[in-house]
């Protein structure tokens, strides 16, 4: 098989990326050497690959800084309405290649490195992923930042600069082991510390009454130090800011110790304050009411709101004087988007500032708060909803608890007015949950304190209205909206799949990265044998590239002409990696039963992290690895079936996986996955989907037509009906000999001969405690997979479907999503106008 072209080779051909200009290449080389000498203080004799990466990153950043400053000047001069995106997670991945692409300097940088005898791909591999997120929610925030900059919105991301991001996953003896992700150990060339904007954040203390009103006193103070990260728009000279807060101990730390003479202890205790931004909580779709997590949430909200108000009050660039001294226009100038309930303390915090510090009336402050804030819900799983114990809030944020109580009191009065004598409805709609330990329901607070509430796919938004938030929908239907998620086509096609990007550009030009709906024009070539051949060639090159990575990293040799069947996402019971595993075992049993039968070879890859405390998820990983061990070492199976668990799945690995996939597994139980965005990345890169009618799969099927996707399993209504009727897994187990054999193997120790009871608990879950109806969907899943195998053998048909998938991806650009948020929630208008480049105008 021919050796795949490297991305660098491919990019030397004429492509979307344009041609490197000689003068620019010379300039890049000059700046690169300057940074090597003056920033890193190295010469070529002692420089390492990492030094070269830092020199290149700084060179690229130099190209961005003028645009960054100019963009911020532009916002101060024009004073548009600002959008503030508040999120506890930003799963950014790497920045170097994305920045070069968005600035339009990729060819120059590659050529300059080539002339200096360096391979730019080796330099790119030196960059640490910025893993400040768990999964979908954090990656969505990152895609949104890219789109907000590309659409010219005056937008600011706010979050926390975790010293340790999502843990690095190692698989040892088939088990997940977590290692800390020390992503900052070599420094981060993209960020700029801003100590001059350091802000105080208070905790604990008590509330007193004064003639001016309530006052929060005797607090413990921590400082929030901002680090600014540039977010370049695509080819429009806009550079927005992601501001991440880091916790710093105050200078006048703990006088008690000084008075006791224990100076050393006082210095050591500074660490306690700084622990707030130490580490990202590694829970995805699971609420764990920890004190430190509550502090993180408030820390981010308190620092961010001070910054928002400072910027609102300042009238022009560089002004620190308060010029706007009335808050009447605040909602006309400020939109605050809460990414899930994690930043929902922004609502009581804004009320506290307006009432206690700015001395507005409650009514005025509440009107401003509601008109400024909007809330995005990301999950319907009850265990994921944030419900903070009152005792914790009382201790850490006593004033905020009072404010929440008052918000709830007025809210209950409104409910009573609209639905008199309905005590049960009042109980259901209260922010204060009284049964068991008293808790505050943060979703209820977010709905009441926002002017807009949205789900992230049509089916999810419908479920919110029909069940999860039905009472609130009946009370204020006008608040509820849908904003189907999207992905940035810059990272998820242009960056990760240059071969396919070039094929598309040859057919429809080069505007599609900002107008993804133009991909629909590809439909006319879906049956074209030449175009099919080219799409197949690019896919094969991407598969060879991934195969080489897998061989190098996992020591597994795979058959690159097999179907690459991939499921990558957080490991969670509702995502049903276990159902995938049942299919693998079924295929294995079929091969063993009749090794000569016609069989479509598959390489099945599963990747994702399990939360460290989630025992069942870790057992599922262990089972997948154990099954892989049996399958991959069975000579009868040979090349027909391989199973690989992809260790340490992260953004950078996703960029290598998505372009190489043939089949995308999106098999959550209907009604559990809010949207999903991995499904969109696979589709955009030409993989076909096997999936349930859940999340965005529903809209993907609508866009491409049911004949271009493999849909199976129960619908939301059918799941509901089965739940009502009563689900007995044994009925399915006894009725289907294939699934019976699979479960007997799992519980009998077939995959764990050294410990026959190792996976008995998994069989127990499947047969006795299965909340996600795996056996009810098993038969439909296996039949759908059989159809997948049959279709794959007809490559002309498969490629036609693949091209139709790509052509139907337009809706799922995060640009479309953000344009909808802008117009329908934030009240701002996207613009595709370019700002002048810094060199085109005089600098002030």
UniProtKB/Swiss-Prot annotation:
PROSITE patterns (alphabetical): PHOSPHORYLASE
Cofactor section: pyridoxal 5'-phosphate
Binding-site residues for AMP, renumbered to this chain: 76
UniProt keywords, alphabetically: Carbohydrate metabolism, Glycogen metabolism, Glycosyltransferase, Phosphoprotein, Pyridoxal phosphate, Transferase
GO MF annotation list: glycogen phosphorylase activity; protein homodimerization activity; pyridoxal phosphate binding
Gene Ontology BP term (one): negative regulation of innate immune response
Residues recorded as bearing Phosphoserine in the entry: 15
Modified residues annotated as N6-(pyridoxal phosphate)lysine in this record: 681
GO CC list: cytoplasm; cytosol
Modification comment: Phosphorylation of Ser-15 converts phosphorylase B (unphosphorylated) to phosphorylase A.
Enzyme class: transferase
Gene3D superfamilies for the chain: Glycogen Phosphorylase B (3.40.50.2000)
Family annotation (InterPro entries): Glycg_phsphrylas, Glyco_trans_35, Pyridoxal_P_attach_site
EC nos: 2.4.1.1
Reactions the enzyme catalyzes: [(1->4)-alpha-D-glucosyl](n) + phosphate = [(1->4)-alpha-D-glucosyl](n-1) + alpha-D-glucose 1-phosphate
Protein family: Belongs to the glycogen phosphorylase family.
PANTHER family in the record: GLYCOGEN PHOSPHORYLASE (PTHR11468:SF13)
Function (record text): Phosphorylase is an important allosteric enzyme in carbohydrate metabolism. Enzymes from different sources differ in their regulatory mechanisms and in their natural substrates. However, all known phosphorylases share catalytic and structural properties. Required for glycogen breakdown in skeletal muscle.
The name this protein goes by in its record: Glycogen phosphorylase
Species this chain originates from: Drosophila melanogaster
């Amino acid at each position: 098989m021919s050796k795949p072209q490297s991305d660098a080779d491919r990019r030397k051909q004429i492509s979307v990326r344009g041609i490197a200009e000689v003068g620019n290449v010379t300039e890049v080389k000059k700046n690169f050497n300057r940074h090597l000498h003056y920033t890193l203080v190295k010469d070529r004799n002692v420089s390492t690959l990492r030094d070269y990466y830092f020199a290149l990153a700084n060179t690229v950043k130099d190209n961005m800084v003028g645009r960054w400053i100019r963009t911020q000047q532009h916002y101060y001069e024009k004073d548009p309405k600002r959008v503030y995106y508040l999120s506890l997670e930003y799963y950014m991945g790497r920045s170097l290649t994305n920045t070069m692409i968005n600035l339009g300097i990729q060819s120059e940088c590659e050529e300059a490195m080539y002339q200096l005898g360096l391979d730019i791909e080796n330099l790119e591999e030196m960059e640490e992923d910025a893993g400040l997120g768990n999964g979908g929610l954090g990656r969505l925030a990152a895609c949104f930042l890219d789109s907000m900059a590309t659409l010219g919105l005056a937008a600011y991301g706010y979050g926390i600069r975790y010293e340790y991001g999502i843990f690095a996953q190692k698989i040892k003896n088939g088990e997940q082991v977590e290692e800390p992700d020390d992503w900052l150990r070599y420094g981060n060339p993209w960020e700029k510390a801003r100590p001059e904007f350091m802000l105080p954040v208070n905790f604990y203390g008590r509330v007193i009454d004064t003639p001016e009103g309530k006052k929060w006193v005797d607090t413990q103070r921590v400082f929030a130090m901002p680090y600014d990260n540039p977010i370049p728009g695509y080819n429009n000279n806009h550079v927005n800011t992601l501001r991440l807060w880091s916790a710093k101990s105050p200078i006048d730390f703990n006088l008690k110790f000084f008075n006791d003479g224990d100076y050393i202890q006082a210095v050591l205790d500074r660490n306690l304050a700084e622990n707030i931004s130490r580490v990202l909580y590694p829970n995805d779709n699971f609420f764990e009411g920890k004190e430190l997590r509550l502090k993180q949430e408030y820390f981010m909200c308190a620092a961010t709101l001070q910054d928002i108000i400072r910027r609102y009050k300042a009238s022009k660039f560089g002004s620190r004087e308060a010029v706007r001294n009335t808050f009447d226009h605040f909602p006309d100038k400020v939109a605050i988007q809460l990414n899930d309930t994690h930043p929902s303390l922004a609502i009581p915090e804004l009320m506290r500032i307006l009432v206690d510090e700015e001395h507005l009336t409650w009514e005025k402050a509440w009107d401003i708060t509601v008109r400024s804030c909007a809330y995005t819900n990301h999950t319907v799983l009850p265990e994921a909803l944030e419900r903070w114990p009152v005792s914790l809030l009382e201790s850490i944020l006593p004033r905020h608890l009072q404010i929440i109580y008052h918000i709830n009191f007025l809210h209950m009065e409104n409910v009573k007015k609209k639905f008199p004598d309905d005590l049960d409805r009042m109980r259901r709609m209260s922010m204060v949950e009284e049964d068991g330990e008293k808790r505050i329901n943060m979703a209820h607070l977010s709905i009441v304190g926002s002017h807009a509430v949205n789900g992230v796919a049509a089916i999810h938004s419908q479920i919110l209205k029909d069940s999860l938030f039905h009472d609130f929908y009946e009370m204020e239907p006008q608040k509820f909206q849908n904003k189907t998620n999207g992905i940035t086509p810059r990272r998820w096609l242009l960056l990760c799949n240059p071969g396919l990007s070039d094929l598309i550009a040859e057919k429809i030009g080069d505007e599609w990265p900002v107008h993804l709906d133009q991909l629909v024009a590809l439909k006319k070539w879906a049956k074209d044998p030449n175009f099919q051949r080219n799409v197949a060639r690019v896919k094969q090159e991407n598969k060879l590239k991934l195969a080489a990575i897998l061989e190098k990293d996992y020591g597994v040799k795979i058959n690159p002409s097999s179907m690459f069947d991939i499921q990558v996402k957080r490991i969670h019971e509702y995502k049903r990696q276990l159902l995938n595993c049942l299919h693998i075992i079924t295929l294995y049993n079929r091969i063993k039963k009749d090794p000569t039968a016609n069989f479509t070879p598959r390489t099945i890859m599963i990747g994702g992290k399990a939360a460290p405390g989630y025992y069942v998820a870790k057992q599922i990983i262990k089972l997948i690895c154990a099954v892989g061990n049996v399958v991959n070492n069975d000579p009868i199976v040979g090349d027909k079936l391989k199973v690989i668990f992809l260790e340490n799945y992260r953004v950078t690995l996703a960029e290598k996986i998505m372009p190489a996939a043939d089949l995308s597994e999106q098999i959550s139980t209907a009604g559990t996955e809010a949207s999903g965005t991995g499904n969109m990345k696979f589709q955009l890169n030409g993989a076909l989907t096997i999936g349930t009618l859940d999340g965005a799969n529903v809209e993907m099927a609508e866009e491409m037509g049911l004949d271009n996707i493999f849909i199976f399993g129960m619908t939301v209504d059918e799941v509901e009906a089965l739940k009502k009727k009563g689900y007995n897994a044994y009925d399915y187990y006894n009725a289907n000999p294939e699934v019976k054999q699979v479960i007997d193997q799992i519980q009998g120790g077939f995959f764990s001969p050294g410990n026959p009871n190792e996976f008995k608990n998994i069989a127990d879950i499947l047969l006795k405690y299965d909340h996600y109806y795996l056996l009810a969907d098993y038969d439909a899943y296996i039949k759908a997979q059989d159809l997948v195998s049959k279709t794959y053998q007809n490559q002309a048909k498969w490629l036609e479907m693949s091209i139709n998938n790509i052509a139907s991806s337009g809706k799922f650009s995060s640009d479309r999503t953000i344009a909808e948020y802008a117009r329908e929630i934030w009240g701002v208008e996207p613009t595709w106008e370019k700002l002048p480049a810094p060199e085109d105008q005089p600098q002030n």
